[in-house]
Amino acid sequence: MAVAGPAPGAGARPRLDLQFLQRFLQILKVLFPSWSSQNALMFLTLLCLTLLEQFVIYQVGLIPSQYYGVLGNKDLEGFKTLTFLAVMLIVLNSTLKSFDQFTCNLLYVSWRKDLTEHLHRLYFRGRAYYTLNVLRDDIDNPDQRISQDVERFCRQLSSMASKLIISPFTLVYYTYQCFQSTGWLGPVSIFGYFILGTVVNKTLMGPIVMKLVHQEKLEGDFRFKHMQIRVNAEPAAFYRAGHVEHMRTDRRLQRLLQTQRELMSKELWLYIGINTFDYLGSILSYVVIAIPIFSGVYGDLSPAELSTLVSKNAFVCIYLISCFTQLIDLSTTLSDVAGYTHRIGQLRETLLDMSLKSQDCEILGESEWGLDTPPGWPAAEPADTAFLLERVSISAPSSDKPLIKDLSLKISEGQSLLITGNTGTGKTSLLRVLGGLWTSTRGSVQMLTDFGPHGVLFLPQKPFFTDGTLREQVIYPLKEVYPDSGSADDERILRFLELAGLSNLVARTEGLDQQVDWNWYDVLSPGEMQRLSFARLFYLQPKYAVLDEATSALTEEVESELYRIGQQLGMTFISVGHRQSLEKFHSLVLKLCGGGRWELMRIKVE
């Protein structure tokens, strides 16, 4: 079986080129789906804010020339009026700049939400998450691209947004204006101003620190959720759990985004404080100079000399230099954005390509699990045969070495099959083909029943437990607890936990629906994890149970008891195992001998 082809554009070296532009434009279509979308309206709001902000900045820039007159003429009343006007303009400008930053942050959150959920839809469609993490090696760290790269891309892009959209206006205008225009008191005042600003900002920062720590925790939880899918992609794929994991991962995303919105609301007041003190500092020099001027210290200077003293920091030139400096500073940010664009764009192109191909070859869709039908309800069309294999040959991905050759097999209800053989002979590989995770290199594999409670259920070699309550572990991967079942469902779960030898687990978790803050893999032993998997199997009650060494950590006595209960519940087993004690629960044994050879024998009933 061949590994899936390389990612679109995988051979190209990421650069600031046409491919970058194409990928960037495709991402923009996700961020701005229409002119009337929320993101487009916020971006238009940002443009209006920056234009208004630049108008106010220009008015502030005219203040120095007016100061020249009042200071040169020693007009105290005029100075007071002008200073009041300047302070009002500075406060207005600081507020506008704060809302500018606030809007950029809201854009970041909204962009991240839309882009991440877009990638989630593609990633959890079918078994794309399994293919990317297990069968392909051309897309590195898809979880990092979705969680970290998207976050950094949106943050960097939002930090550039206001500067980029206003730069053409400011550069042209201030270039023209620049072309046309061609003691102890100071230190004490400056230090006092600095100390005051530090105290105010320290007060405003207090509520932010705790919220920021919580945000970083949720960021780690969100990354861990994707890591959990990556590490357990195969068990999740056997469970056909893409839909439920999609919901759970989006749920963690929503918690993170809600915390970020709360954090940014608190940061708004900090922005106002910081920016107000930043811009008030621009007139501090005038205030410092005004005191000695009106006290007669500079009485011997002419008006021209006073003007020279006051105009040391000419507004237009300084601001023009600042505009160019900002653009130069953005070059580093732009290179980062280009890198993230290529990584996200390549992942998106690969997922879209896989999605198009899977429409033709996918055996079953998300409805395959019957996720909205509780176990115990009648199936629509019961089937007597689960799998029909005709001259099937199997090889591992990226390998031509045959594991199984020309296998013909019919697995029917009541005819349990035991698969044995040494390590590396293809036992689990055969289950992967039955589960649709791999394709056979030759022959025909037909699955004549459904996945889920009324058809086939796989218990992978490595038990899989998602985040959630004890009830959610037992009913997994069903999405919801069915309200119509009520206490009857509770009784079934408790009974099956007891049959699996886990009645004490209810006390440890303080109930079926108590949220736990631990990782199930950290608190359960290997034997307990296998017992809990059987409790899940009993609850779902499939007609066919495919077990990949599902009792390897249990004693033969416990193994026999669990198999006996499964038989009483009407299950037909397809088991991979090594113990001879398993034979009494099966009708046939398929022995894989290596090199593609196999033997199919009927087990004699003694």
Curated annotation (Swiss-Prot):
Residues 39-332 form the ABC transmembrane type-1 domain. GO terms for molecular function: ABC-type vitamin B12 transporter activity; ATP binding; ATP hydrolysis activity; ATPase-coupled transmembrane transporter activity; identical protein binding; long-chain fatty acid transmembrane transporter activity. It is a multi-pass membrane protein. It catalyses: an R-cob(III)alamin(out) + ATP + H2O = an R-cob(III)alamin(in) + ADP + phosphate + H(+). Homodimer or heterodimer. Interacts with LMBRD1; this interaction induces the translocation of ABCD4 from the ER to the lysosome membrane. Interacts with LMBRD1 and MMACHC; this interaction ensures the transport of cobalamin from the lysosome to the cytosol. It is linked to Methylmalonic aciduria and homocystinuria type cblJ: A disorder of cobalamin metabolism characterized by decreased levels of the coenzymes adenosylcobalamin (AdoCbl) and methylcobalamin (MeCbl). Clinical features include feeding difficulties, poor growth, hypotonia, lethargy, anemia, and developmental delay. Belongs to the ABC transporter superfamily. ABCD family. Peroxisomal fatty acyl CoA transporter (TC 3.A.1.203) subfamily. This is Lysosomal cobalamin transporter ABCD4. It comes from Homo sapiens (Human). The lineage of its organism: Eukaryota, Metazoa, Chordata, Craniata, Vertebrata. The gene is ABCD4.
